């Protein structure tokens, strides 16, 4: 018999409007420790490798969970995308910190960071924040209404299309970042 109190607790957490903040704050705290103890002492090549890995992982999970396995029931999909968003917050904090340390080292050595690479790092993190703060709470509210009444609100398809559009932009940014950092490792 499944533990319903645990699943209810998880569902409440996922639907909590402050859940993103509850994930972000400890993620930033952990990343500060990692930054001070690990990233500042890591070689530039290793930072590039970690950035390639983080962006490739984020790209693969987002592509798989958002596009390849999308035909889901409303409640299952809602929980899955809420969990994915919380994981993306953690990965986004890690990726941004790695990028900032990498960029600092490149510039300190009179190097150049092109704008496309910079945007390909910042766009996925920004999209994740927009999804966590606005799109997911809106979609959660509309999905609950559909579950309750059985009728779709006219705004639900628009919000859903916006979410899909943002996911597409995020996947493109992650692909560009992963490919660019991966290419740097071959030079």
Language-model features and meaning:
Residues 177-187:
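Juxtamembrane boundary at the C-terminal end of a transmembrane helix
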Residues 112-134:
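Short alpha-helical packing/oligomerization segments
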Residues 70, 128-146:
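Inner-leaflet juxtamembrane helices
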Residues 106-107, 139-147, 185-186:
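Membrane-interfacial segments
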Residues 2-18, 22-113, 150-153:
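Interfacial loop at the N-terminal end of multi-pass membrane proteins
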Residues 50, 54-57, 87, 120-123, ...:
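Physicochemical signature of membrane-embedded alpha-helices that form the seven-helix bundle of GPCRs
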Residues 141-160:
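Acidic interhelical loop/turn segments
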């Amino acid at each position: 018999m499944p533990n319903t109190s645990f699943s209810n607790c998880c569902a409440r957490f996922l639907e909590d409007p402050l859940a993103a903040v509850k994930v972000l704050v400890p993620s930033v705290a952990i990343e500060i420790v990692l930054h001070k103890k690990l990233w500042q002492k890591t070689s530039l090549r290793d930072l590039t490798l970690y950035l390639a890995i983080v962006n490739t992982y984020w790209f693969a999970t987002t592509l798989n969970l958002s596009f390849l396995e999308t035909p889901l029931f409303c409640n299952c999909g809602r929980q899955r995308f809420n969990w994915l968003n919380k994981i993306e917050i953690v990965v986004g904090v890690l990726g941004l910190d790695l990028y900032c340390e990498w960029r600092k080292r490149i510039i300190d050595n009179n190097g150049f960071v092109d704008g496309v690479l910079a945007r390909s790092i910042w766009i996925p993190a920004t999209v994740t924040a927009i999804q966590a703060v606005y799109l997911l709470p809106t979609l959660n509210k509309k999905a609950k209404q559909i579950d309750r009444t059985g009728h779709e609100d006219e705004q639900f398809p628009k919000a859903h299309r916006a979410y899909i559009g943002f996911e597409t932009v995020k996947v493109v940014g992650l692909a560009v970042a992963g490919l660019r950092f991966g290419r740097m490792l071959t030079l």
